[in-house]
Amino acid sequence: MSFGYQVLGFGSDHVRAKFITATGGSIATSGNFKIHTFTGPGTFQVTEIGNAAGSDSVSYVVVAGGGGGGGSQGGGAGGAGGYREGHVSGSYTASPLSTSAMPVSQTSYPITVGGGGAGSTTEGPLGANGSNSVFNNITSAGGGGG
C-alpha cells in the first residue's frame, strides 16, 4: 500500500530555506516537488519550514487497505480502501475531495499505512476488513470485507 506526500514551500526569503526540508519514507524529486512515499508505518519529520510562517503546506494522498474477498464461488469482492487527498495550486493537482493543502510545522507526523484484509479461504465467512491509513488528522477508512 503506497502513501505519499508532495512537499513544497513558497517565496524568495533568503534568510530561511525556500522549501520545506523533511525526512521519512522513500523520497523522490520532481521539479520543485519532493514526494515522500510510505509503504509501511513511519514518521514524516519536518526538519525546517520554508519562508514566511503559514506559507508552508503539503499536498497529500492517504489510501487505506482494501477489504479481503469472500470465500467460495458466491463470495463477493472486498471493498476498496478509502482515499483522501488535498493539494496546493500548481502543476500537481488532486481531486476535489479537498481543495487545500495541509499546513505543517517543524515537528514529527506519525504515519499509519493500512494493510489489506485477508480473503476468506472457505465457504461462508466474509473476507476481513482492510485497515485505516492515517496522516495527522486525515484518516482513510479501510475497505469492507466481501
Predicted regions and their residues:
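Glycine-biased low-complexity/repetitive sequence motifs
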Residues: 1-146
